[in-house]
Amino acid sequence: MVATTKQDRIYNKQKNGDFDLATTRWGPDYGDPTTYLTMGISTNSNNYGKWSNSEYDQLVDQVGVESDVNRRWQEMKDAEKILLDDYAYIPVFEKGAATLQNPKVKNLVIKPCRTISFEYVEKTE
């Protein structure tokens, strides 16, 4: 059965885990996979499904302090696998934004999470 409710109650119902299926909005805060992975940590306030997996939490914590980029990447892949195999979570990402750019500006990189890289920017005449 589908039940409708007023907008002001939806957030509270989700926050309290009072739902069978729910959608919500959220977008990445920065250009690193951990912006997504931290959403599944058992103590994350956006973890509305109250999912908890101590192995996952430990992996994501380790990713936060790992200095070896190859190990860090593998730990993120391992955490993602746990998240997608064990958690009833379907990440859907669609974000739109308009950007005006002077045609004389070349090689400006705007990533999907809206971070901008000026590393290779050139201005032509």
Give residue spans per PLM region.
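Extracytoplasmic/secreted envelope proteins and their assembly/folding machinery
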Residues: 7, 11, 15, 34, ...
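Short secondary-structure boundary micro-motifs
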Residues: 22, 32-33, 47-50, 76, ...
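Bilobed periplasmic-binding protein-like "clamshell/Venus-flytrap" ligand-binding domains
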Residues: 22-25, 67-102
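A general marker of short, structured functional hotspots
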Residues: 7, 15, 26, 32, ...
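Extracytoplasmic/periplasmic, Sec-exported soluble proteins
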Residues: 2, 6, 25, 47-55, ...
